[in-house]
Regions:
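N-terminal signal peptide c-region/cleavage motif recognized by signal peptidases
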Residues: 6-8
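Beta-sheet-rich non-transmembrane sensory/scaffold domains
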Residues: 12-464
Length: 465
């Protein structure tokens, strides 16, 4: 059983420890280019932004476009990571068959020229990250099927995996899969082919383990980097929306009302980051929630066979996990902190939804689904404190929740960064450079009335006392 040991704290301290100054916004104008995942290169002071048809390289000081790198000859780019002047792009095969093997392509960040041949990895490489010493590159191959509307789910579904690339030879030395991996925890969705789809990877400080979110399975998988294999899969349990502090709005009825109700939310995290506190590793998770890529995995609580009454009648729930009177929705609408064994030590409860509503950026049209949908998380150390930045994919303006998580058992909500004119932050990058601290936000959806997506850079400053 996973226990909640910390109560969410929503009150903002009298004096905020951080302030945020918007430095620039870049509008991505190349046809088909979106703003999805940013990465910073300190050798050239540039921000690299992956977004479907290519990667835009932006001047870190001004936000102007340095170069657009087209990748359509390889497929569609999902992510970018940079280490010591080397950029790696995760590229899926794309139409007509995204189940085919993807590739990783490397670029020199100074010359912006390709290095070597593409490296073939698994199906739909969705995210990648270097180990701290740069010796390995880990690639999360999500392995989703083509037919998103296939209610019978008969389309071949490629297995999810993590490709491990040795950076000295730039070859795949192992592909970590999920067959026969020991399973622990609760509410683990265990259809290996359909549910075990890696989303995001975080590496612990000593570089011995990686923690992989397996969103549709409601799990974290632990990857041993000496064995290059998964050693355990941990089910993350479910959030009880009937408990005080876990209020949510289950109806898209034009009125925002946060209530406690007899329903549960499968955590199903997307983004994950790791940090140390008192010589122990903790994981920070953005509990977005996601159904499988087929309509058979979702239902409406008021319909047969559930027949839930208002206010739960419009709630979207999991067909796989729910039964009449026992409803499970996708996502926890929160940020959580867990020990590496899956123990829940903090959950933000209803804070992200309610704070978005307080700032008039809560979208009631998403209430029946997953609320603000916490998507990504990035951690920044400033002045001896550790701060978590949590991107909210489904607000009416780009919104980032900010928490002080220095002590994981006493995490505190601090602020929410709202950027009018931007929408749907997909990826975040935080970095220190030349004595300053920065937050880059990749917003993947054009704002209302706009035709392009934006990347925005903020400077993060400590409050002066």
């Amino acid at each position: 059983m996973i226990l909640l040991l910390a109560v969410p704290v929503a009150a903002t301290p009298p004096e905020r420890p951080l302030s945020f100054t918007k430095l620039w916004t870049h509008s991505h104008t190349t046809p088909g280019q979106l703003s999805e995942i940013p990465a910073f290169d300190r050798r050239t002071n540039t921000v690299w932004v992956a977004g479907v048809v290519g990667v835009d390289v932006l001047d870190g000081e001004t936000g102007t476009l340095v170069e657009h790198i087209d990748v359509t000859g390889y497929g569609l780019v999902n992510s970018v990571a940079i280490h010591n002047g080397l950029a790696a792009f995760a590229i899926e095969a794309g139409p007509p068959d995204r189940r085919r093997a993807g590739v990783v392509v490397f670029y020199n960040t100074r010359t912006r020229s390709r290095i070597g041949d593409p490296v073939t990895v698994g199906s739909l490489p969705d995210m990648l990250t270097f180990t701290h010493d740069g010796s390995k590159l880990l690639v999360a191959n999500e392995g989703t099927p083509n037919a998103v509307a296939d209610t019978a789910y008969t389309a071949p579904d490629p297995p999810g995996s993590v490709s491990i690339i040795d950076m000295e030879t730039r070859t795949v030395i192992a592909t970590a899969g999920f067959d026969n991996v020991p399973q622990f925890g609760t509410n683990l969705r265990t259809n290996v082919g359909m549910d075990f789809e890696p989303e995001y990877i975080a590496i612990d400080k000593d570089g011995t383990r990686a923690f992989v979110t397996v969103q549709e399975a409601n799990a974290i998988a632990v990857l041993d980097l000496s064995l290059n294999a998964f050693t355990e899969i941990i089910g993350l349990g479910a959030k009880d929306f009937s408990l005080p502090g876990n209020e949510f709005d289950p109806r898209n009825d034009g009125t925002v009302t946060f209530i406690n109700a007899n329903a549960y939310g499968l955590y199903m995290p997307d983004g994950v980051a790791s940090y140390r506190w008192r010589d122990r590793t903790y994981l920070v998770l953005a509990n977005e929630g996601d159904f499988r890529e087929d309509n058979a995995d979702r239902a409406t609580a008021g319909n047969a066979p559930y027949f839930a009454a208002a206010p739960l009648d419009r709630l979207r729930i999991s067909n796989t996990d729910s039964s009449p009177g026992n409803l499970y929705a996708a996502g926890a609408r929160s940020m959580s902190i867990r020990a590496v064994d899956g123990t829940l030590v903090y959950d933000s409860g209803s804070i992200l939804d309610t704070e978005a509503h307080n700032r008039r950026v809560y979208d009631d049209g998403r209430s029946r689904d997953k609320g603000v949908e916490p998507e990504g998380v990035a951690l920044l150390d400033v002045g001896g404190r550790t701060y978590a930045f949590v991107g909210l994919e489904r607000a009416t303006s780009s919104a980032i929740g900010v928490f002080d998580i220095t002590d994981p058992y006493a995490a505190t909500f601090l602020d929410m960064i709202v950027t009018p004119g931007d929408l749907s932050p997909e990826g975040l990058a935080v970095f220190a450079f030349r004595g300053g601290f920065y937050l880059a936000i990749a917003n993947e959806v054009p704002a209302v009335g706009a035709t392009t997506t934006h990347t925005t850079l903020y400077r993060v400053d400590q409050a002066k006392h």
